[in-house]
From Swiss-Prot:
BP GO terms, sorted: lipid metabolic process
Function: Protein component of the very low density lipoprotein (VLDL) of egg-laying females. Potent lipoprotein lipase inhibitor, preventing the loss of triglycerides from VLDL on their way from the liver to the growing oocytes.
Keyword Disulfide bond assigned: yes
Name used for this protein in its record: Apovitellenin-1
Organism lineage: Eukaryota, Metazoa, Chordata, Craniata, Vertebrata
Length: 106
């Protein structure tokens, strides 16, 4: 039982999500820049599958996912991925401008 709980906690920490926020997000929303949409959806599917098999284990997952540690990790990941996304967009813009000016001569 202890190994099962450790595995469940590891999965929750890996996915870094809270279940109520998962249901409000869409995987195929092209305007979103949040890279955590896919792990959130995976966490929702895992929660739903576990909850169907054992509501008690599902409640345990829900309780663990709403702890301050998991929320803190998730907020950190959201902030860092947002920063990385912004940097990647700036890099792509610079590459595009470089191609236009140096390669195509615009």
């Amino acid at each position: 039982m202890v190994q099962y709980r450790a595995l469940v906690i590891a999965v929750i920490l890996l996915l870094s999500t809270t279940v109520p926020e998962v249901h409000s997000k869409s995987i195929i929303d092209r305007e979103r820049r949040d890279w955590l949409v896919i792990p959130d959806a995976a966490a929702a599917y895992i929660y739903e599958a576990v909850n169907k098999v054992s509501p008690r284990a599902g409640q345990f997952l829900l309780d663990v996912s709403q702890t301050t540690v998991v929320s803190g990790i998730r907020n950190f990941l959201i902030n860092e991925t947002a920063r990385l996304t912004k940097l990647a967009e700036q890099l792509m813009e610079k590459i595009k401008n470089l191609c236009y000016t140096k390669v195509l001569g615009y």
